[in-house]
Amino acid sequence: MVHNDLIIGEGYHRKAGEPHAEVMAIRSVENHDLLKQSILYCSLEPCAHYGKTPPCCELISSHGIPHVVIGTGDPHSKVDGKGVAHLRSHGIIVEFAPSPKVYRQLNEVFWTNMTKNRPHFTLKWAENNTGHIDKNRTAAEKPLSISGSLAALRTHQLRASVDGILISSKTASLDSPSLTTRKWSGQSPTPIILLSQDFPLQKEWLSSLKVKPVLIGKVLPEGYPGITCDPRDLNQWVPKLLDLGLNHILVEGGARILQSFIDSDLADSIHKYISKDQLEEGVNAPEAPEFTTIAQLGNDRYERS
């Protein structure tokens, strides 16, 4: 909320079911009399329907806010221009920002959910300088430690920002990962495990998970929620994850799953860490498109697409 070029209020949408950003921005203004001479700037078109919260466009018009600047329209079928139409019908000036791509990136998870009817997938892996993500090993051997402490911290920060974390039962069997955000504040994501008869899950590991997992396979263990289908066919289960409230998913492995997401054009973003270590032979890292962001995290090279 801006009054005479001064910010008098601001807000953001914390999570589904809680008040939207417009509501929080209006609530944060101490003197509501100023709203009638203020401009509301929002990244997404104000909603126009009753869902988990009331319509934001009605709240805006009820406060007499005369001017609204919007980053981008809302692709949701229940909005899609209806919010703008309501505002203009109440005499409110509505403008759109000149660079909608910036605001779509800001709301990239929502845009993927709405326009592609599936979760937003972020892929993550670490590889050494020779392009391997692990050594060839048995279940009795520990996984190869590749990235350093800063990369690990960044990974846990990523985990805290997503709804689910996806791995294969092979990765679960070989590594027994905790899949938590123990190195970063925030709630741990829901583990999503793709089952394979060749790598049955250990009951001890399943019971050790902090969050009850979602299992995907032809036959599911009793007592665990999941999707019964062929996990190798992504089309059978990817859209169903939205129904479970899993809007943003971090895919951590293994290599075959990561490559399948890339090949299926499901890799919405990729985070890759490259160490200076070398390995003559091992498990090859996925082949990915060009990366646009390059930085240094301690001794590791960080690339992101």
Language model segments and positions:
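Short, acidic/turn-prone active-site loops that include or flank metal/cofactor-
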Residues: 13-16, 72-76, 99-100, 195-199, ...
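Zn2+-dependent cytidine deaminase-like catalytic core
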Residues: 2-103
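Non-catalytic positions within long, well-ordered alpha-helices that form the structural scaffold/packing
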Residues: 61, 242, 262-263
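Short, charged, surface-exposed secondary-structure boundary motifs
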Residues: 79-80, 105-106, 201-204, 223-227, ...
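Short beta-strand scaffold segments in enzyme catalytic cores
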Residues: 1-5, 125-126, 132, 303
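Active-site ligand-binding patch in enzyme domains
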Residues: 112, 120-248, 256-259
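Conserved histidine-centered catalytic loops in small-molecule metabolism enzymes
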Residues: 281-305
